[in-house]
């Protein structure tokens, strides 16, 4: 609420609505004219006399205000009055009269669990004081909202609830540290956890970070189409506090989320543990960016069978492990449903030789997967490491790897593995498999990405090669996939703008 001011009939004023909605603006000004101080009454009358009844700000990022069909002289007078009259009215009537500055951009502290439908509104900041559970309710987060996590905090959306974090290209939802810019670091807070009712292959599955006797951490079921909600145009920064020794939360955790969950245009930046981890489920990911994760960038376990298109992993030189780490089930490698995700149009960048060297893809414990139209670039250890039983997975078509560009990997730049004798995969030879002519993979020494990919503050992920020079596979015919993406990597070489523009960010701290 806004403090009472010099106009008793105006309890509070919403600035965005005032600018966007002429009827609302007129109502506020009429109340000020009727009940305000003489000075404010005069200001209200003057602005009403010059107001042409049009919105003063677009209602959405896609809407453009149309110019009023007036003469140039009248238009100059109208905009002059906006500058000289409307702004003081907003500044005086809204800020002085109603204490508006305490309303817009106010900080709302959250400590209690959410058990009824709740909206976190644009123009506000919300601070998580501890681990907040959403149970049996929908939490809606409007575009432009910033959620700051204090040490030890996290947002856990249980399987009985849904999260609708719908940002926009120009107003993303941002989950970040509560510390001031310049003082933020990995692990400042926990992260975002979504739990659902889709199949997992682990009995009595429960999420890490929730006490064993707390049933709110349970997830999984039989509903392959279950929805955990929508996370769209959203950034998650500086997450991953240590729950207990060597066990941290991920930036984004998806446990048993089904195919009706929408995870699209999401960046996870500088997480202390994994960027995104799936525990079973059938959730799909699209337009995903993971930058500077301190462990794996994308991790999966317990039977995840989702699809991914347009994903970028940028691993920083000083931290991180694998770009992808895929497991099925450590207790039973053949557990069903088997982990078998599908990837198209992915860029993995490993930063080359550095203090912390990386591996692009590690598959183990029975995980299958399908990897196509990928650029795997600058991994000092190796591009692919398979462990445990692999030959059977390839034979049953549960593991495929084709039409990929492998560039500048290994010690000499042209290897896909470190040393075949070191692999615990019962003699499966990744090198020979990848180089099989029928798979149409390309292995080259020189990098396949532009030099700016090395930047940690303003990276670009456009490939060097043209579309014509690429050997790509057409994505499957399905509503989820963009079938026109006949190129390798997550960024169209021909595009002048990309899906990364406007909403992503790369703060160091």
List each language-model region with its residue ranges.
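N-terminal intrinsically disordered, acidic low-complexity segments at the extreme N-terminus
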Residues: 49-76
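Short, charged early-sequence alpha-helical segments and their helix-coil boundaries
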Residues: 29-53
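Eukaryotic low-complexity, mixed-charge intrinsically disordered interaction/regulatory segments enriched
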Residues: 1-31
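Short coil/turn segments at secondary-structure boundaries
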Residues: 12-17, 43-47, 206, 246
């Amino acid at each position: 609420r806004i403090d009472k001011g010099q106009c008793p009939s105006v309890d509070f004023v919403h600035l965005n609505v005032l600018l966007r909605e002429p009827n609302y603006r007129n109502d506020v000004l009429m109340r000020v004219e009727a009940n305000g101080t003489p000075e404010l009454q005069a200001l209200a009358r003057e602005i009403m006399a010059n107001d042409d009844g049009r919105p003063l700000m677009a209602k959405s990022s896609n809407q453009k205000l149309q110019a009023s069909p007036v003469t140039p002289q009248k238009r100059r007078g109208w905009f002059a009055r906006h500058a000289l009259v409307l702004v003081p009215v907003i500044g005086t009537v809204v800020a002085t009269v109603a204490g508006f500055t305490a309303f817009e951009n106010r900080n709302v502290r959250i400590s209690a669990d959410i058990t009824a439908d709740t909206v976190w509104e644009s123009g506000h900041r919300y601070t998580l004081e501890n681990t907040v559970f959403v149970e049996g309710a929908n939490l809606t987060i409007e575009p432009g909202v910033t959620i700051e996590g204090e040490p030890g905090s996290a947002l856990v959306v249980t399987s009985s609830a849904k999260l609708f974090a719908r940002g926009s290209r120009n107003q993303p939802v941002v989950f970040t540290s509560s510390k001031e810019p310049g003082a933020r670091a990995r692990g400042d807070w926990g992260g975002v956890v979504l739990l659902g009712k889709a199949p997992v292959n682990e009995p009595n599955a429960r999420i890490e970070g929730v006490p064993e006797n707390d049933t709110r951490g349970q997830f999984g079921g039989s509903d392959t189409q279950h929805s955990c909600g929508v996370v769209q145009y959203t950034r998650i920064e500086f997450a991953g506090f240590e729950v207990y020794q060597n066990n941290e939360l991920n930036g984004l955790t998806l446990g048993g989320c089904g195919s009706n969950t929408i995870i699209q245009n999401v960046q996870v930046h500088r997480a202390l543990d994994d960027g995104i981890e799936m525990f079973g489920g059938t959730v799909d990911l699209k337009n995903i960016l993971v930058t500077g994760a301190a462990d794996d960038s994308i991790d999966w376990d317990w039977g995840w069978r989702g699809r991914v298109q347009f994903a970028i992993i940028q691993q920083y030189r000083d931290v991180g492990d694998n770009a992808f780490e895929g497991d099925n089930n450590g207790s039973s490698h053949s557990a069903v449903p088997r982990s078998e995700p599908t990837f198209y149009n992915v860029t993995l960048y490993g930063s080359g030789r550095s203090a912390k060297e990386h591996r692009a893809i590690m598959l183990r414990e029975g995980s299958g997967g399908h990897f196509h139209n990928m650029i795997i670039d600058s991994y000092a250890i190796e591009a692919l490491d398979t462990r445990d039983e692999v030959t059977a997975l390839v034979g049953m078509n549960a593991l495929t790897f084709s039409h990929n560009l492998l560039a500048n990997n290994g010690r000499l730049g042209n290897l896909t593995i470190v040393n075949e004798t070191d692999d615990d995969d019962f003699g499966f030879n990744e090198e020979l498999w990848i180089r099989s002519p029928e798979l149409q993979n390309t292995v080259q020494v020189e990098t396949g990405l532009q030099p700016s990919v090395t930047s940690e503050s303003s990276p670009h992920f456009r490939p060097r090669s043209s579309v014509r020079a690429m050997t790509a596979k057409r994505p499957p015919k399905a509503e989820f996939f963009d079938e026109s993406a006949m190129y390798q990597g997550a960024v169209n070489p021909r595009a002048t703008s990309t899906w990364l523009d406007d909403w992503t960010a790369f703060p160091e701290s």
